[in-house]
Each structure stands twice: as C-alpha cells, then as structure tokens.
C-alpha cells in the first residue's frame, strides 16, 4: 500500500475542504494527514485557538480506516514575514512529522504539501515523491506577511 504524508492548510474537522476530499478519495494508500499549526499568539486573538497549543500531544484520529489525522505543534508567529522564523518552525514540524512516520512505519512516502512555507521543510522529511498542490495564491492573503518572500518560497517549493 502506498504511503502519503499530507501537510494541509486546513484542519480535517469541522468543515471538509478540497484537501480532505482529495485524501479521502485515495483508497489504496495509508495517509498521515497533518492539521496546520496555530501560532503561539493565536489564542490571544481568538480564544477558540487555545486547544491548538496542545492538540499535537493527542492521539491521532481516524476519519477513515486508511487515514490518521494529527495536529502539528504550535509555531512562532510572523513566519510569512521573516524567513529565519519559518526555518525554525519548519525544523520543529519536520521532527514531529518524522516521529509520526516512524511510529507508523512510513518509508518511501509521497509528501503532499499545500503551503509555500513547507519549502523549508521538504528537505527535512524523507520522501520519494513530492506534490505541491497549489490551490491558493498565498501571497495575496494580506496581513502580516512579506508577499515577495511568500512568492519566493513558493517558487522554491515548485522547483523541488
């Protein structure tokens, strides 16, 4: 059975998006689906984000027999603005993903990513294939980001 590690930009629950639809329609693969991180500042802005600070410590959930969903650990904010922060965050996430891969006996995986920030992660997670499923223009979201940096990470990721 094929092994897929999916680093998503939207959580599996509560509202299914295209990412969940794609993964749920691959029946001949075992999938580790990782919900996105929250930043350490997120709960200050939105109290509903507070559980995101510790969700990564929970056991994985199984929305389907072949899919296990985990939450990624929280990250430092401003990763869309400062590359050095993104690199720190991605190293932390890569360690977490590698640990879950070991726990599930995952080798020779297809790494499936949705965010340009993973440009700093993909070389840290062993994989035999890479899919960058570009569904949004991330640099157009606005907010606390450097659009030039986000576009540069996206180009780097697309070239891997």
Task: Set out the residue ranges of the language-model regions.
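Short, conserved loop/helix-junction motifs that constitute active-site signature segments
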Residues: 25-27, 123-126, 157-159
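An aromatic- and histidine-rich active-site surface loop
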Residues: 93-94, 110-126
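A conserved catalytic-core segment of Leloir-type glycosyltransferases
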Residues: 41-106
């Amino acid at each position: 059975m094929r092994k897929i590690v999916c680093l998503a930009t939207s959580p599996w629950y509560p509202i299914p998006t295209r990412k969940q639809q794609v993964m749920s329609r691959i029946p001949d693969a075992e999938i580790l689906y990782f919900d996105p991180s929250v930043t350490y500042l997120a709960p200050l802005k939105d109290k509903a984000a507070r559980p995101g600070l510790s969700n990564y410590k929970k056991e994985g959930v199984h929305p389907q027999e072949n899919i296990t969903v985990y939450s990624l650990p929280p990250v430092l904010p401003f990763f869309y603005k400062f590359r050095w922060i993104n690199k720190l965050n991605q190293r932390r996430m890569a360690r977490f993903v590698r640990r879950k891969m070991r726990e599930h006996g995952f080798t020779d995986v297809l790494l499936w990513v949705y965010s340009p920030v993973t440009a700093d992660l993909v070389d840290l997670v062993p994989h035999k294939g890479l899919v960058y499923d570009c569904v949004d223009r991330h640099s157009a979201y606005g907010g606390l980001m450097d659009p030039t940096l986000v576009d540069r990470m996206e180009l780097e990721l697309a070239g891997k």
